[in-house]
Amino acid sequence: MDTSSVTMHTERACCHQAQRAVAAMLDKAPSWLIWTAVLYVGLPFMLYWAVPYLFYHNKTKSRRIAIYVLGDLGHSPRICYHARSFSAAGWEVELCGYLEEQPPKDLLDDPRVTIRALPGASNAGKSLGQTARKVVLQTCHIVRQLWELRGCDYILIQNPPSIPLLPIVAIFKVLTRTRLILDWHNFAYTVLQLRVGRFLHPLVLVSYAVEFLFSRMADYHITVTAAMKDYLVQSFLLPARRIAVMYDRPGEQFRPLPAGERGAALAEPFIRGYIPAGFDVQRGDTILVTSTSFTLDEDINVLFGALKIYESAAAKFDTTLPRILLFVTGKGPLKGKYMEEVRNYKWERCTIHFLWLSAEDYPRLLQLCDFGVSLHTSTSGLDLPMKVLDMFGSGLPAFVMDYPAIGELVQDRVNGLRFTTRRELEQCLIFAIKDEHTRKVLKENALLESKNRWHQSWASAMSELQVVRQS
């Protein structure tokens, strides 16, 4: 055997002997000593690498917020306004939601705003199994996306919908010490209650429990009305100091049309083809607009019924009543049904068009109209229709369906008119069209409303909650 072989054999023997000695020592050592050694070696690793990787992997020097909506970003104006305002305040913004329509161009071009699309949400169908499958898929997508977003200082979510987003984000908030802002537009359980017809339905009770329990884990709350804040304090037992009222206000894209430009605007390609022959706004013909989601809490038949009464009045009692052009914007589950009803009616004085507009064209349409109509009634009675704010931003007086909280936004015969039935809406139309003084007062006050802007409302609420301080 040569010298090198002897040396290798000796080294192996020494190694095995050392291993046996260490094994014997560990076998006789007390367990606390072993765990002390493990902690001594492992704790620095956990603190300096593993924990930051798990919870703060994407931490940035500037403040960072993830803004979530389980809806289409292109048609979620309040969420987009939040993104603009946080970006303007110097924050990094992660804007998360579905991309059915393109979001506003300024957000796409903003270097501080990163848009993160959730995989498309197909219709769940009516069966419980299909709904459960959709919730499971949404949960997987949200969890995966939140993993990528760990390190955010804040998460802001829109409610409703609350399932599955609210429980997931509430748990994530605890694990990562992210602060959670809950932006209340309405209550998910009241929306579901409208569909099933009663509060004591298992699904409604589950939805109520989710909102009641997990809302307590939020650090801050924003509501769209003072009535909603009172409800959260009295019924959900949330502390008033953590709740700020942030009224919806129109974005900067909603502006009144400068005087003298209406004729040229009506000739623009996006709208020109919808103007009927002989329709003359100079002669008093009137353009109305309504935006709807074609759901049960907005009975658009009230508007169509009012126009039918208007047609009858024009034929039987007052042939001088002007023509009406109505634009119906939006989409939803009952749209096809209403379109068929309109097609099957013989209209004489009224023309109705159903539109689905881009985020850029919708403000341009509002500028061309004389009055806006809102049929929103609110499943809770506590929220306000965003569409009316857009109308006010464009200088349009609004005819609104009356319900408890609407008085926080629309003062009857000041900046709009309120109604409860189709007959009352028809009377509002004739009153506003025929009475020059009323029309003038409504227009002047709507123009005053157009000066109330989103950023002032946002800055005031964020300062009250001490999230963003006013400079």
Swiss-Prot record:
Pfam families tied to this protein: Glyco_trans_4_4 (PF13579), Glycos_transf_1 (PF00534)
Keyword annotations: Endoplasmic reticulum, Glycosyltransferase, Membrane, Signal-anchor, Transferase, Transmembrane, Transmembrane helix
One cellular component term from this protein's GO annotations in UniProt: cytoplasmic side of endoplasmic reticulum membrane
First-level EC class: transferase
Membrane topology, Lumenal segments: 1-31
Cited InterPro entries: ALG1-like, Glyco_trans_1, Glyco_trans_4-like_N
Subcellular location: Endoplasmic reticulum membrane
Transmembrane annotation, as ranges: 32-52
Residue ranges annotated as intramembrane: 127-147
Domain of life: Eukaryota
Disulfide partners: none
Cross-referenced PANTHER family: BETA1,4 MANNOSYLTRANSFERASE, CHITOBIOSYLDIPHOSPHODOLICHOL BETA-MANNOSYLTRANSFERASE
Protein function: Participates in the formation of the lipid-linked precursor oligosaccharide for N-glycosylation. Involved in assembling the dolichol-pyrophosphate-GlcNAc(2)-Man(5) intermediate on the cytoplasmic surface of the ER.
Protein name in UniProt: Chitobiosyldiphosphodolichol beta-mannosyltransferase
Provenance organism: Eremothecium gossypii (strain ATCC 10895 / CBS 109.51 / FGSC 9923 / NRRL Y-1056) (Yeast)
